[in-house]
Every structure is written in C-alpha cells, then in structure tokens.
Amino acid sequence: AQTCGDTSAGFKPFIAEMKQEAAAQGVSKRSIAVLDTVKYDAAIIKRDRGQSIFSDSFLTFQKKMISNYRLQHGKDLVQKHKATFDRIQKQYGVPAPVIVAFWALETDFGATTGDFNTIQALATLAWDCRRPEKFRPQLIASLQLLDIGDLTLEEVRGFWAGEIQKAFEI
C-alpha cells in the first residue's frame, strides 16, 4: 500500500505552492486566503483508499447503484428540465443522460449531501501523491467558484471526495 500523503509532513509547503498556482491562474487574494484555513485531514485519505465499490464487478455495481426509481426519476428530470439540458449540451457537449446519471449516483438527485469542508478535502487529496493531477485543478476551480460568487465559503460543503453540494436552480 502506498504511504505518500499518509501524514501532514510537507502539507504546509504544498499549500504555499497551491497558493502560488492559484495566483498564477488569476484567483483573488481573498479566495487564496481560504487556503490558510485548511488542514491535512487523514480521515479523507483513509476514506479515499477504502472505496470498496471500485473492486466490484460491473454487475455487482449495477445491482447496488441502479434502481428503477433512479431510472424513472432521471427520465422525468430530463423532461422537466429539457430546455436547460439542451442549453448545457449545446454549450458544453454533455448530454442530459450523462449529467442525470452522475446526479443520481453521487447524490441520489440531491437527497444526500455531505458535510465536509470540500476545499480542505480537495487540498488533502491534491497533496496525496496518487492522483494530484485530478485534485489540484479541482482545488483551483473551487477557489475560482468563490471568486465569481457562485459559492460562498459557507456553501463549500459536501462529500469527502470534494463534491460540492450546492443546490443550483435549474
């Protein structure tokens, strides 16, 4: 098992590096200052490394995660918000069923939310050597969301893997 990221050793210099990277990408000093509040969270690393669902076969995963309710409710939401999904597909190229599938799997259509500080979670995951290329950009993006006003610091709550649970109006 990998041991990188198992301790906070080196986390503060890493945060200093991320602050420089955020500044280079145009993030405001106000949003960058949020990084001064984050701490290494060993519980995040433990959860990340303990995801047993990724060792399941597809059939086992399907039985656990796909239900008639999710399929029908997903179809209903695609119809209900058709104009919004059409606009998203036109602008970003992502079809409605893909978005709705993630919505279902990640939050059961918003029914479940987390209460983790997602910036702290993303910083911890970005520090871990296993997938920094995934989490460093997400950490910067979360600071950018603060900058443009799509989120407030109080709203940057969600699941341990950094998913932000803001209920957006669609």
What do the PLM-derived regions correspond to, one by one?
Residues 7-33:
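Mature N-terminal segment immediately following signal peptide/propeptide cleavage
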Residues 27-170:
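Catalytic glycan-binding domains that act on GlcNAc-containing polysaccharides
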